[in-house]
Amino acid sequence: MPAHEIIEKAIRKVADFPKPGVLFYDITGILVNPKAFSYCIDCMEKEYSAAEVDAVAAIESRGFIFAAPFAVRRKLPLILLRKKGKLPGETYGINFTLEYGQDVLEVHRSDVTRGQRVLLVDDLIATGGTLNAAAQLLALGGAKVIGIFGVVGLPFLHYQKALAGFAVKTLVDYSGE
């Protein structure tokens, strides 16, 4: 079975989670399948092999899972973007709107440097709102997002609009099925 098919088979689709009418794309099947998990990281490595990247930034919490092994392989710093109040010390913060309310992302001020070229990673790209806020957050410290990577993309939720101007790469796209 081709590796790409292994990824698709590993992603469970859970109806009515976390609330009625929502189809949840569960990536945990990738994590318990070493071949699928390795394939994800291999794809990131191949996609960004020629890219000038100074650091990898990851969205809490499932973005950490995919960004960390890539950062280790490339010997790059890993910048954690966390929810409000989870980071000690001085932070940059940004408020943003979700489909179900407001949220805040923060990053340590000391982790972001002016001119830093950052690859932004999350497990799933839905509306693009969180990733757009993350890019704005990194810009507060002078960093520039050179690409956005997600294992799963949901283009039917129009993330392309929120992330216009960014080079977005996903491994698997779903059309709402």
Language-model regions: role of each:
Residues 21, 56, 148:
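Residue-level signature of catalytic and energy-coupling elements of molecular machines
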Residues 53-60:
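Short glycine-rich phosphate-binding loop at a beta-alpha junction
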